[in-house]
């Protein structure tokens, strides 16, 4: 065995051209290396010259394998045009396997001639993409530049949601305007990958005058408002008075509204302490957003300073539409308005519900019967709510509403339980429900047959194939 050491990078499965084992690896036959394959490329097991191997590091590489050649190994350079230190061999020995995520491995590679700064510090970008934080830390200590490769290091760290990596890179950035504005661009464009903690890191790095510009760029940044202490620090740095802010707009109204939407009650209370008039502006919008937040505690808090009475009818109906039973029950019991609600609107909104608790509560309270509603059963079938379908049928829901649409929806969803309930509870199910016959013919022929009782074979052919028998 020849004594010179070579390298080989392999993936997590320890393979790239094939599956490898410790010790001697032989590629097919010994004469393959001298032949030309069908795609006009030579074949063999790839190995690398350590001093040039940086040119061959690839994104998915996870291990470094130590390679030694057999004494009668036949090998050729893989690419004569690019001197990248890559060779093919018909046989070679694979020795120790090292984790590329270990800084010790990187030190060993450097000792053997590997150039970590090659390809514009590609190894740092590779470490950031692979979440190898300790390797990145070591590379930065020995001079790697996080701004190379078009700042791909930052983009990879942010995309991976790697808090420690982002923090490390921010601690090692050059102090130039060019780099600063590139970081703002990364922060804006990759914000969907930033959780609140990574966003806070960037905000600590952002200049005070840019805080409002960044935080208003998209809704992802607004989740930092949940941390009241962090918001206090932003207010201390000038939140609400930065660049690109309309000076006629109250400083904190937008942020307060976003806290309502997201249910950040503690931060709302903090804003109220520094601007006692904030809740008096846009009252209806604040209440409507509190409903959409589905946070009853936020609604109750706003209610202390906002007269909800004039809006209560619309709010109850809106909550019914979006199945907010907790809100509906709270408002009805507190404001005692059930007798003044429009009965037709109530029936319409009950018909849109798919919440059994809400339906039961409202029908019992108002005296509206299930048969009076139109659409409840169809909605329940559409949303595959078997329990609600059974309840509605027991209460007398019309299985033929909308020309038998409940059955069509159940067939479309392939829900055998609902189909069985519809058929069992309604012996008078419409026999001219052609859409249901068509949709059930291939999947539930027994249902199609039952629905087709009394229909001539010629008419049935026309229904199924949409074509008359000539």
Curated annotation (Swiss-Prot):
SMART domains: ANK (SM00248). PROSITE patterns: ANK_REP_REGION, ANK_REPEAT. InterPro entries: Ank_repeat_dom-contain_49, Ankyrin_rpt, Ankyrin_rpt-contain_sf. ANK repeats lie at residues 119-148, 149-178, 372-401, 403-431. Keywords: ANK repeat, Repeat. This is Putative ankyrin repeat protein L279. It comes from Acanthamoeba polyphaga mimivirus (APMV).
């Amino acid at each position: 065995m020849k004594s010179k050491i070579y390298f080989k990078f392999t993936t997590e499965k320890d393979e790239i051209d094939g599956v490898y084992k410790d010790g001697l690896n032989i590629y097919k036959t010994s004469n393959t290396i001298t032949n030309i394959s069908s795609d006009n490329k030579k074949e063999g097991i790839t190995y690398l010259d350590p001093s040039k191997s940086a040119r061959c590091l690839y994104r998915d590489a996870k291990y470094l394998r130590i390679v030694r050649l057999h004494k009668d190994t036949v090998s050729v350079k893989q690419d004569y045009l690019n001197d990248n230190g890559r060779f093919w061999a018909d046989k070679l020995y694979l020795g120790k396997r090292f984790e590329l995520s270990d800084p010790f491995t990187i030190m060993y590679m450097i000792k053997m001639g590997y150039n970590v700064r090659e390809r514009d510090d590609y190894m740092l970008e590779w470490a950031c993409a692979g979440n190898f934080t300790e390797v990145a830390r070591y590379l930065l200590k020995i001079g790697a530049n996080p701004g190379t490769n078009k700042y791909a290091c930052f983009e990879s760290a942010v995309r991976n949601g790697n808090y420690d990596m982002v923090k490390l890179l921010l601690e090692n950035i050059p102090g130039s305007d060019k780099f600063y504005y590139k970081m703002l661009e990364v922060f804006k464009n990759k914000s969907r990958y930033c959780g609140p903690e990574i966003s806070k890191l960037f905000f600590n790095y952002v200049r005070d005058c840019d805080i409002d510009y960044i935080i208003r760029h998209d809704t992802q940044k607004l989740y930092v408002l949940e941390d009241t202490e962090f918001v206090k620090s932003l207010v201390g740095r000038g939140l609400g008075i930065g660049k690109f802010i309309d000076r006629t707009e109250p400083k904190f109204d937008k942020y307060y509204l976003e806290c309502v939407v997201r249910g950040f009650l503690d931060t709302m209370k903090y804003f109220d302490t520094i601007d006692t008039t904030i809740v008096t502006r846009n009252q209806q919008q604040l209440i409507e957003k509190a409903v959409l937040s589905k946070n009853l505690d936020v609604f109750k808090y706003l209610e202390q300073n906002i007269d909800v009475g004039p809006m209560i009818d619309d709010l109850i109906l809106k909550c019914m539409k979006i199945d907010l039973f907790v809100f509906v029950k709270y408002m009805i019991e507190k404001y005692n308005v059930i007798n003044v609600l429009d009965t037709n609107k109530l029936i319409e909104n009950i018909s849109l519900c798919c919440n059994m608790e809400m339906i039961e509560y409202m029908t019992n309270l108002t005296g509206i019967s299930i048969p009076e509603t139109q659409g409840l059963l169809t909605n329940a079938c559409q949303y595959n709510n078997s329990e609600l379908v059974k309840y509605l049928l027991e209460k007398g829901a019309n299985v033929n509403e909308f020309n038998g649409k409940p059955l069509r929806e159940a067939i479309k969803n392939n829900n055998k339980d609902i189909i069985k309930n519809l058929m069992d509870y309604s012996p008078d199910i419409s026999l001219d429900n052609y859409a249901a016959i068509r949709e059930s013919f291939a999947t539930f022929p027994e249902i199609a047959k039952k629905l087709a009782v009394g229909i001539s074979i010629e008419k049935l052919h026309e229904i199924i194939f949409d074509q008359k028998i000539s």
